[in-house]
Each structure stands twice: as C-alpha cells, then as structure tokens.
C-alpha cells in the first residue's frame, strides 16, 4: 500500500506520509451526534462521494478548556461533531498487520485521540503495527445516563461510541493493511476503565481479541446512582424529567457549565468520578469485575498494571488534608463498610495517606481484582511502573507517567515531569514498546530481552518496569492480603 488514498465502506479517504508512516486523521466512524442525535446511541456515518481529506484531526469532543493547554501547544477546535478515528500505518507494503486501538483517559470528561502524546507514528513504525486512536463523547454528552427517565435514550453513550469505533475498525481496517481478527484494545486511566467495561459489554463482543489496561480497571455507578446524578443535572438546567426533548436545544457551553457546577457541588466524596459508566440492563448489564469472574471475557489475554505512585498526580504538597469523616466516607464508598473498618489503620489521617488511598483503592486494588478474575479464563500479565525522575517535585512514578514510554513520544516526558531524555529513558521506552507490540502480535508480551511470566493468583508475578527490569512475586503482599481478606475472615 504505497498510496495514501484508501477506500473504506463509506467512501475514499486521503492521508499523508511522513517519516515512514502513513497517517489518516479525522475519519468519521459515526454520524455526528448533534441535534436529534445528541444523547442517542451512535449511528453509522453517511456515505460520501468525493475523496475525504483525512490530513487533519477532527474536532475534539466538548470538554472544559482550562486544562487543554497541558496537552496541546495549540488549542484544538471543540465540537459535538467529534466522532472520528485516526489511523497510523507503517509505509511498508504489508497486509494483515496487528491492530492496536487506543482509548484515551481523562476521567470520562477530558481528552482526545488527537493529543500529541498519543501520536501513533513511532509505535506503528517501530512495531510494524497499525495504531488507531479515537474520540468518544465525554462528560454529560457521553455519560449522562437518561434511560431511567425515557427508554428512547441510551446509557453509556461514550462506551457505545468506543464499540462503534471498534466496529468501524473490524469492517474497514483491512483496507489500511490491518488484520481485523487481530485487534488489541489499549487504554489508560478512564481508557483502562472503559476497556474493563467493554470486556463485559454485549455491544463489544467479538470486536477485539486482546486487551491492555493501564492504570484503570472496573469503575461503575449503580443504576440508582446514575439516575440521581442525571436528576441533579437536569435540576441545574431547570428541565424536568418529562421534558427531555429540551436537552436537544441547550447549548454545549451550558451543558458543560451545568456539569462543572455539579462537580463542584459534589466534592464531598473525593474519590467519586461524577461521570463514569453505569450499570444498565441493555448496555452494561453486570458489574464488569463480576462479569469477568463469571467468564464474560473468556479467551481474551490481558496485560494490566499501574504506576507505583499513581495518587501523586492528583495532590500537591499544599493540598487540603480532608476531615476524618470525609476519609471514612471515601473508604466506605470504595470498599463497603465491613472492609473499610478493617483497613482504616492503613490510612491514618494525613496528606500522604490520602495519596496512598488513591493509589491503592482507585488503581492498584481494582487492577489486582481484575487480573485475578481474568486469570481463570485467559493468560494475564501484570506490571508495575516504578521509574521516576530524580528531581522533586516530580520524583514519583505518578499516574500517566508511562504514556510517553508506551508511545515513544518522549518529548511528552519533558513536558509532564521536566525529565531529561537519557539513554536509560530511551531503553525503557524501547522495552515497554517491544512488550506491548509483541503482546499485540502474539498474545504474550515476553520478548528476547525480557522473559515476562504470566500472573497466577498463587504467586502473583509482577514485572517491575524501572531502569532495571525485575520480577516480584506478590508485591506489597501484606497490604494486598488486608485489602483482599480471604473468605472466612
């Protein structure tokens, strides 16, 4: 495939070639979710006649703009017309390459597949793989669950968008040189949490063969929590539950403002995501971790892990230390009352404890639970990313720090952590990319350089990603045993 014009099911697309990589940006995978389609499940895109110019990214989905400067040098356009995929392919004439589909993070209300950090060029070139990045609806546009009030509306729209993008990949990626039967989904934070849900979702069944979950596992609201969140949102807008059609005429700005107001008002539970997937009989019938424990993702190999110091991204040295009541409520919300009482002594009231609580309970414990559940049905590999810069205040392996290494976009490391790009950094990036790519190709991340043993509940082998690669069995064993008491305790 030496030419950049490719024929998809919906029409022709024209991309560019740069540094040995073909790139197609801003290809629609669904109808724009605007007007009557706002808050509705995604529909396939319309067919187009001319060649579509796919040389620039599509708009990002609506989100608060105050944080965008952290990710972009130039602020991108925002629009509800945002359901686009981007495809990166090596410019060698090849067919049936493994496909890696990236699902970005951002707490379900921020982010885009077009962030510079997620440019798939280096990964595609290094690994002879096709990399696909995508946008999905965020915040109230993607995770305002309205089906309790009116059956015409679907819940979990952001997840349905991701499934629609995966369906587009299944139906079109062979035209770009990819193998539709060898698709790996990979994602971080809310992207990892999304994959936890996709593995349990009827709409995503059969659309991918392997999964990589970085710093994010199962995370859902109950149907009741979702309904009360939506009711509170409607109240801020002054719309009653019988007038949902009014939601179609509210401006995107006003929807974002209402979301912001609610997020500020609901701050009392410090560990609750305001927008997140919800349990719902049609789209997500069972809590993902429970579904996985019952074999919902049988036969899908899983690579999963966290960073050692996840929580340090979310607090600064002068962050508030929350009251004991707030911390107790958060523990109870995350663990249920009986277990919360048993582990309270792990987290005495201090800023450091708050940070550890976040690391352990939002990221590490769910990852261990998910890995354990899936290990009965498919091979699982577990990692912990320990590398960190030497200079304070960045001298921790904080949340998202592995991303520049995964994509090989190491300039992102300078931006995120003021870290120098040393030979050691380049080597670690190469090691991580090789493992991820090998997993996408074969379903096993072991390479010639690194023999990575699979994860078993008895031994809990964990690859430690640092300047030196090591293997630890059951890291932080004592804490893990407290957080997972055996049945009789």
Curated annotation (Swiss-Prot):
Keyword Phosphoprotein assigned: yes
Record-listed Phosphoserine modification sites: 189
Gene3D superfamilies named in the record: alpha/beta hydrolase
Catalytic EC class: hydrolase
Any GO MF annotation of the entry: cholinesterase activity
Effect after changing residue 390 to E: In strain: NRRL B8079
Coiled-coil portions: none
Superkingdom of source: Bacteria
Active site: 189, 310, 399
Keyword set, alphabetical order: Hydrolase, Phosphoprotein, Serine esterase
Effect of substituting residue 95 to Q: In strain: NRRL B8079
EC number: 3.1.1.-
Range of residues in the leader sequence: none
Effect of residue 230 to A: In strain: NRRL B8079
Keyword Hydrolase appears in the UniProt entry: yes
PROSITE patterns linked: CARBOXYLESTERASE_B_1 (PS00122), CARBOXYLESTERASE_B_2 (PS00941)
Binding partners and assembly: Monomer.
Role of this protein: Catalyzes hydrolysis of several beta-lactam antibiotic PNB esters to the corresponding free acid and PNB alcohol.
Family: Belongs to the type-B carboxylesterase/lipase family.
Protein name (database record): Para-nitrobenzyl esterase
Protein species of origin: Bacillus subtilis (strain 168)
Gene that encodes it: pnbA
């Amino acid at each position: 495939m030496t030419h950049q014009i490719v024929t998809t099911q919906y029409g022709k697309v024209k991309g560019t070639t740069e540094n040995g990589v073909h790139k197609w940006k801003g290809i629609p995978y669904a109808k724009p979710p605007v007007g009557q389609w706002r808050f509705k499940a995604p529909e396939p895109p319309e067919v187009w006649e001319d060649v579509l110019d796919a040389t620039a990214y599509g708009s990002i989905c609506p989100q608060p703009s105050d944080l965008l400067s952290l990710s972009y040098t130039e602020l991108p356009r925002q629009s509800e017309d945002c359901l686009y995929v981007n495809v990166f392919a090596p410019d060698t004439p090849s067919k049936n390459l493994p496909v890696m589909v990236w699902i970005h993070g951002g707490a379900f209300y921020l982010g885009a597949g077009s962030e510079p950090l997620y440019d798939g060029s280096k990964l595609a070139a290094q690994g002879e793989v096709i990399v696909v990045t995508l946008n999905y609806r965020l915040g109230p546009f993607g995770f305002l669950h309205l089906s309790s009030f009116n059956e015409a509306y679907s819940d979990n729209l952001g997840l349905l968008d991701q499934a629609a993008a995966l369906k587009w990949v299944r139906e079109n990626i062979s035209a770009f040189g990819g193998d539709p039967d060898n698709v790996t989904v990979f994602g971080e934070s809310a992207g990892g949490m999304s994959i936890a849900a996709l593995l349990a979702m009827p709409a995503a069944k059969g659309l991918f063969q392997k999964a990589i979950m970085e710093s994010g596992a199962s995370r859902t609201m109950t149907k009741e929590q979702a309904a009360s969140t939506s009711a509170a949102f409607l109240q801020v807008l002054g719309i009653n539950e019988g007038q949902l059609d009014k939601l179609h005429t509210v401006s995107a700005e006003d929807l974002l403002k209402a979301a912001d107001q609610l997020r500020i008002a609901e701050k009392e539970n410090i560990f609750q995501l305001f927008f997140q997937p919800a349990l719902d009989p049609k789209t997500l019938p069972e809590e993902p971790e429970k579904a996985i424990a019952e074999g919902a993702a049988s036969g899908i190999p899983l690579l999963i892990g966290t960073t050692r110091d996840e929580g340090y991204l979310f607090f600064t040295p002068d962050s508030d230390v929350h009251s004991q009541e707030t911390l107790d409520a958060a523990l109870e919300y995350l663990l249920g009352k009986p277990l919360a009482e048993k582990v309270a002594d792990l987290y005495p009231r201090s800023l450091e404890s708050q940070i550890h609580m976040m690391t352990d309970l939002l990221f590490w414990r769910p990852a261990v639970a998910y890995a354990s559940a899936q290990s009965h049905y498919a091979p699982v590999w577990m990692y912990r990313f320990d590398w960190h810069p030497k200079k304070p205040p960045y001298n921790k392996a904080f949340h998202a720090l592995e991303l520049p290494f995964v994509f090989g976009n190491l300039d992102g490391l300078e931006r995120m952590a003021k870290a120098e790009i040393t030979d050691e950094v380049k080597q670690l990036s190469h090691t991580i990319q090789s493992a991820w790519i090998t997993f996408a190709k074969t379903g096993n991340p072991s390479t010639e350089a690194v023999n990575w043993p699979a994860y078993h509940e008895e031994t809990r082998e964990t690859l430690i990603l640092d300047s030196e690669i090591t293997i630890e069995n059951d890291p932080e064993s004592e804490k893990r045993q407290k957080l997972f008491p055996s049945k009789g305790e």
